[in-house]
A protein has these predicted regions:
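Phosphate-binding loop of NTP-binding sites
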Residues: 1
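Active-site glycine/GP-rich loop and adjacent strand/helix microenvironment
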Residues: 4-193
Length: 193
C-alpha cells in the first residue's frame, strides 16, 4: 500500500526530518521551512486532497521542492481533472512541475509521471484500455477504462480492471482522465482517518 511504501522510503532516508505529517500542517510547514533554509533536497509525497488542504491553508513557495501527489480525492473533496489539480499545487508550492504516482494496493508496481501527467510503467507492468460498455473489448492504444497487468504479482492476481478512465499512447505511456461515473471510492489512503 501507499502507507507501507512511504514508510519504507522514510526509513531508508535515515534523515531526522523524514516522517509522516498526517493532518499536522503546522509541523510540516515548520519542517519544510527548516529544510529550505538548509538547502536540503526534499521530496514531499502526499495524497491529492492532503496537498490541496495544505496549500489552501497557506501557500509555501519553494521552487526546488519535489512534490509528488498520489491517491486522488477519495471522496473527501470535489474531483478535479489532473491539470487543474496540478496547476493549484504548482502555484501553492511555487514549483514548475508536480510528479505523480499511480498504483494500488492490489499491485506491487507503480507507474510514475515526472510532471507532465503522462505515466510510464516498469517493463513488467502493462496497461490496456477497455470499452466502457464492453469490458471484453481490450486495446493497447486509445481511450477507455484502464486495466493493469503487473507481473510482479507472483503469488496473487497479476491483472486487474480498474474504474479509472484513461488514454494509452503509442509508446505505452498513459494518462489518467478520471473515474467511471458512480464508481466506488477506494484506496489505501482511506485506511487512515
Amino acid at each position: 500500500s501507499l502507507v507501507y511504501m512511504v514508510d519504507d522510503l522514510i526509513k531508508k532516508s535515515t534523515h531526522s526530518k523524514s516522517g509522516f505529517y498526517l493532518n499536522n500542517h503546522k509541523e510540516l510547514r515548520a519542517t519544510l521551512k527548516e529544510l529550505k533554509s538548509q538547502k536540503q533536497k526534499t521530496l514531499l509525497i502526499g495524497v491529492s486532497f492532503g496537498l490541496l488542504d495544505f496549500v489552501e491553508e497557506q501557500s509555501f513557495q519553494w521552487p526546488e521542492l519535489t512534490v509528488m501527489e498520489t491517491g486522488g480525492m477519495k471522496g473527501r473533496r470535489k474531483e478535479l481533472i489532473r491539470e487543474e489539480l496540478q496547476q493549484i499545487l504548482k502555484e501553492g508550492f511555487g514549483v514548475e512541475e508536480i510528479h505523480s504516482e499511480y498504483g494500488m494496493t492490489e499491485l506491487l508496481s507503480q507507474a510514475y509521471s515526472h510532471g507532465d501527467g503522462v505515466f510510464t510503467c516498469p517493463p513488467w507492468m502493462k496497461v490496456l484500455v477497455s470499452d466502457e460498455d464492453d469490458p471484453t473489448l481490450l486495446k493497447s492504444i486509445g481511450r477507455g477504462v484502464l486495466h493493469i497487468i503487473d507481473l510482479a504479482n507472483i503469488y496473487s492476481c497479476s491483472f486487474i480492471a480498474t474504474q479509472d478512465l484513461g488514454e494509452i499512447n503509442e509508446d505505452g505511456s498513459f494518462q489518467v482522465l478520471g473515474r467511471v461515473d458512480a464508481s466506488d471510492r477506494r484506496g489505501c489512503s482511506l485506511m487512515v482517518v
